[in-house]
Amino acid sequence: MRIAVFGTDATHGGASRAMRRLIASLSRRGHAVDLVCLTPDPRMADCLAVRRRVKSDPENAMDDAAVRLFNERYVRERRSAVSNTLFAPQLIGYALADSGLLEAYDAFNIHWVSHFLSIHGIAEIAALGKPVVLTLHDMNFFTGGCHYSAGCRGYAADCRDCPQLRDDPLELPAAVLRWKRRLYAEPNVTAVAPTRWLGGCAAESGVFREGGVTVIPNSIETDVFVPGAKDAAKAAIGLDPGVKTLLFGAYNNDEHRKGFDHLAEVLRHMRADARIEALRGSGGIRVLAFGRSTPDLAASDYPIHDLGLIDDDIRLATAYAAADVFVLPSREDNQPNVMLEAMACGTPPVAFGVGGIPDTITDGVNGRVIQGFDTAAMAAAVTELLLAPARAAAMARAAREAIEESYPLDLQAARYEALLQAMGAKTAAATERVRRGVADAALSHGRDGSCFVEAPLSVPVDLKTGVYGFALNQQAKLDTAEAELRRLRAVVHQHEREQEALSARLDAILFGLTRSTSWKATRTLRGGRERATPGSRLGTDRPVSARQKLAEVMTLLHSTSWEMMAPLRLLHRAADRLWRRLREGLIP
């Protein structure tokens, strides 16, 4: 089967990591899978980058205005304190359906595509009539723009009065949800959710009422993320084997929903236990952290072992193996990669029972699930596992067994394969085509051998009419005004630089004139018969502008004392030329 997979970024974040795993496992099952993305991974052979095709200047200006208004400014300037997770209306994107690139494929799998594909662009891909599977890494495919709703259930209604926006004069989230319900309601468009929780939310939204929602858990490399000897793993990262360790990590620890503040409270509650306090005082406990750390962690009064961003699976597996407990204090989450990875490495997790986490963690069996964001209860659970090695080891074994049973790569790939076949996709055996097939005509090749396709940005008709069209035109006018302001500022800056250069040159001229022999020789004359120019260097005040300095130079050059010394200056120059000619042997 020929499958095109779409994702904004092939390298960073949990969604791209899960996407790459699925691509690898589908490829191992014999399918030809290409990744189409904005930010390619140079390590991936079948990775096509999308670059913007330049239109005429007026069209480009309007496209840029649409991006700034709908994809950037409107939301950014109105965000409330409810959440700092990305909010992407997904209204402007690249038009790939007409590029010729997609003709050779049998099916399409669309992952995290904010700032890449728009709602309307996805609908155009679906209009090609081939199976389209939208893999849900968060809630964005079925909300008015939020990637996580922060507890709001507006997606089940109409997304009006969005709590993540302070004000919403265009009622944009409501319009986005309406467009999704209209454009994604096709029998060949199916959503795949990794967890029952996310699948239930997607079904509740009504966005996929035609193609439906299927639950297929994500997967993990069970041959890479494996249990290791904890003493050896601790030694490998520079720790004493006897130290108790708890691990916290996320790609972006500053994201509010990841619960970093909860972790700080958990650590504080743990200090109430005399045994933990004794370990802390003696250096017998360490907090391990990876990802983008925050200053608050250092303020916890625990010894911190910051592992930074880890982009190597072997090093990451070592970090998990070095931990006695993995702490997952998220407020909102789907099926965190870090949870699966920790469990695969035999490290029991302690997490809040949010989102899809209870699908994987069975409380008291392969980890602990804490309800209600009770940080004191989470602290007690972490403490118990740190101080009861036998119980932690039993949970570790159960965690590994759960991963081996439900989350291997091939199991996820087989389920996707069955879904695509059920949606009417052609099997690999029935499509013997040359690699990339008729899509070759749409491809360009870089000097480094990489492949890319050029596609224009597309602004849907829905945004060019009515109140949205009015707002877009106002944004275009504002962009024009801002561009003119930038041009004028550049002109002023250049003028100021020229003025500074002229002023410096005049300073040098004045310095030379006022220290010349002609000027010094007539000092007595000036004191008696010629008064200095008021406000000049010759008087008491320093000139403040190039115009004043120029006037001063001209006054000096036309002064009586300067003119009286003209014959002497001419005689001096003649003598100087004569002396040079004598030295050069030009005069015998």
Language model region names:
Residues A430-P588:
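Boundary detector for helix-to-coil junctions that initiate low-complexity/charged tails
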Residues T318-A323:
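Short alpha-helical donor nucleotide-sugar binding micro-motif in glycosyltransferases
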Residues P348-A351:
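Short hydrophobic beta-strand element within catalytic cores of glycosyltransferases
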Residues L239-K258, A264-R268:
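Conserved donor-binding/catalytic core segment of Leloir-type glycosyltransferases
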Residues A377, E384, R391-S406, Q412-A418, ...:
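A short, well-ordered alpha-helix in the C-terminal region of glycosyltransferases
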Residues R280-R286, F290-A317:
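Nucleotide-activated donor-binding/catalytic signature segment of Leloir-type glycosyltransferases, i.e.
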Residues D363-G364, R368-T375, E384-P389:
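Conserved acidic donor-binding segment of nucleotide-sugar-dependent glycosyltransferases
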Residues R331:
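Aromatic "clamp/platform" in nucleotide-sugar-dependent glycosyltransferases that forms part
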